[in-house]
Amino acid sequence: MIGGGAIGLSIAWRAAQAGWSVTVHDPAPASGASWVAGGMLAPLSEGWPGEDAVLQVGAASLARWPDFGAELETLSGETLFTSHGSLTVALDAADAADLRTVAEWIAGQGYELELLSRAQIRAAQPSLAPNIRLALLAATESAVDNRALIAALRSACVAAGVEFVAEAVTDPGALAADQVVVSAGTASARLWPGLPVRPVKGEILRLHRRPGVAPAPTMTIRGSVHGRPVYLVPRGDGLVVGATQHESGEDTQVTVAGVRDLIADAQTLMPSIGEYELHECAAGLRPMSPDNLPIIGRVSDRVVLATGHGRNGVLLTPLTADAVVAELDGAPLAEAKSASPERFTFNDE
């Protein structure tokens, strides 16, 4: 295994359970996008007409999360799930029209979302802004604590006999292994020539609720302010607020402008958020593919790719692990077919 984020650790764990001897190579495990992620499991809320394959892959992974998460919680003692349900809100008529379009499209794909009126929104989430006019409820979605997930996966890997090597790999072909899985996030593009994965920077804030301040929403809240997407994810005694999107190479510095926009946009959705403590600002690099689908599958006799998960790495963790182990066993997973590397043309080994 090359890469020790949520994707790499989940593959290592499942492969070890399947009888493989597994070694994870990563100089700084879980220090990348997995550490900064919001932890949303929200394929329906993030769905958009035309991205049918993205929706289907995400929904297939969401369906695996209850059993996957429960098994990890039992093995590790960590508490993973932080909230259940997602609410996407509309502040103006254009946003409300978009929500209705998405709800209709999602229904056509065989999934159900519920439109909530202004009064229903206020009753369900009283801390939200009173001028929110419509919302889309995805009751089957959840959110997990990404850092607890990393800790749980690490514990599960150790218990399953996975070994760890704190070194970077520059040539997958040089590893003395029967099979090599490349799951190194944005670094994957340096390990396999022509791999169409690019870094997209995302900044997030972690806020703590102070005494006497209105409580956080009980579910993930998503919206758009001045054309910028923003989300609020319940996390312990506070919230995770995210996330900016910038294509700026390998830059992971948090900017003043990014923090300003996140706070302003979050406060538009939840006015009392201005009274929360600003606990942490962080940035990571999403490994994006050209079509927003991950890249999962074999590219040579020895190398399997598991990368390009973009903003959905945590969501797609269980499906990716199952798909890679199936690939290693010579029986590719049908639910991951649309994520095959065969849809791209790039160099092989």
Predicted regions: what is each one?
Residues I2, A176-A187, A321:
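Short hydrophobic core segments
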Residues S272-E349:
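C-terminal catalytic lobe of FAD-dependent flavoproteins
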Residues A53-A59, V89-D98, L136-S155, Q253-A257, ...:
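Short beta-strand to alpha-helix junction loop
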Residues A135-P172, Q179, S183:
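Helical element adjacent to the flavin cofactor pocket in flavoenzyme catalytic cores
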Residues A16-V36:
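Glycine-rich FAD pyrophosphate-binding loop
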Residues M40-Q120:
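Dinucleotide-binding Rossmann-like beta1-alpha1 core, especially the glycine-rich loop
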Residues W13-Q17, P27, M40, T79-F81, ...:
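Active-site substrate-recognition segment that forms the wall
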Residues M1-T23:
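N-terminal Rossmann-like FAD-binding beta1-loop-alpha1 element of flavoenzymes
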